[in-house]
Amino acid sequence: MKLRKHLLWLCLIVCIGLVACPVANAIDAAMPNPPASPTEVSVGVFVADIIDLDEVNENFQIEMILIAVWHDPRLAFDAEKEGTKEKIFQGPYQFAEVYTAWWPQLLILNEVGRGDYNAVKLTVYPDGMVRYAEQRNVLLETPMSLQDYPFDTQRLKAYIVPFGNRKEEVVLKINDGLRQATDE
């Protein structure tokens, strides 16, 4: 009886293993790792508008475009064969459902709440360069020095980190060419 019980458990474990392995492989295939260690990601923020500045609560709301650029040789393609010089994944459906490769999930540490995602676009170039842009409205907390108010000057900061990756996997670099603001 004991032997039969042990064999039954062994069969159950083997069956679960056979079923779980393809699932695990499918999950790994859908969410691959960064292309290299470390993967360098150039990041910049275009500030389109400062919507609100709250000195009392030390926060500010902005409309921004977050831009990230990296190289993933696994995505390289022959432009002539494909009939296009770039592959574009635009909008939440194409980005979330059609594009299945790795991208750096960027988290703003001092963001209050969830913010509004208004647009997303990911472009893959023939050499494997990838450009990601998302337009969002965010509320950010930052310490303010108000001693000279109303003649003060403030540095409004956003702290961006790669979510879900260790520093050995993804390194963010500020790209001044991607860091801008409107003149208004």
Predicted regions and their residues:
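Extracytoplasmic entry segments of secretory-pathway proteins
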Residues: 6-7, 23-25
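Soluble non-transmembrane domains of integral membrane proteins
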Residues: 25-184
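N-terminal secretory signal peptides that target proteins for export/translocation
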Residues: 1-5
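Bacterial N-terminal signal peptides
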Residues: 9-20
